[in-house]
Amino acid sequence: MALSRRDFVKLCSGTVAGFGVSQMFHPAIHEAFAQTLTGERPPVFWVQGQGCTGCSVTLLNSTHPSIADVLLKIISLEFHPTVMAAEGEGAYEHMMRVAEKFKGKFIFAVEGAVPVAHDGKCCVVAEADHHEVTMTEVTKVLAANAAAVLAVGTCAAYGGIPAGKGNETGAMGVSAFLKKEGIPAPVINIPGCPPHPDWIVGTIGLGLQALATNTLGLLVKQGLDANGRPKAFYKNVHMNCPHLSAFEAGHMVKTMSDKDGCRFSMGCKGPRSACDSFER
């Protein structure tokens, strides 16, 4: 049964509250989500580079709203190698046609790192006119014309495992790659291995809200932290830890089996970590 606009706004209210988004964002995100029911859904292109597809799997596990609602009611997913029925040259050409039609109005999501070594041949995402289209080519074209770029997962955000020392592919994160190419696209990092589905869907909501109100620049400048992550979802773990008082009192555990005390002495990276796991 199709959701009414009123029902969907109610659904989004519960959803965004679950995201932990500050109250100042709630009405706008609700409206941005709800507008997609009666208005034109923004095109989204999801391209996969060097990764394990884990970020796609976590997105498919979204429950509030369900992935069906996300794909069929909130966005228009025009390209995603894992879930789309189309394939081959036809699917790629469709993506490029839609990207041209909605230039400056679509969302470009990248999963996986971007390999630049060996002319980018380490990751071929399509073939057109007997030409192998590399991840580097697609990223440059789509990022330059996107309203916003979402770097989904740690590999896309910062390079992740593919960019580890000794890699032969020259893998790098999306932001670093675009900076190297001189492409000033607004990038929102959603790190995690994999990121929680709420972070992905919630960031899409923030993006829709910013696009609808022409405040994308403000979101990028004020809504992201120093590492390009949405502040709404990447809060400091240490400051929200149930053992914070023990840390401040200098009460440290001596073994991992100790029930009481702060785990910092055992190597906890809470003070340097950011995510809202304490709310999940």
What are these model-predicted stretches?
Residues 7-30:
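N-terminal export signals
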Residues 59-65:
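Short Gly/aromatic-enriched secondary-structure transition segments
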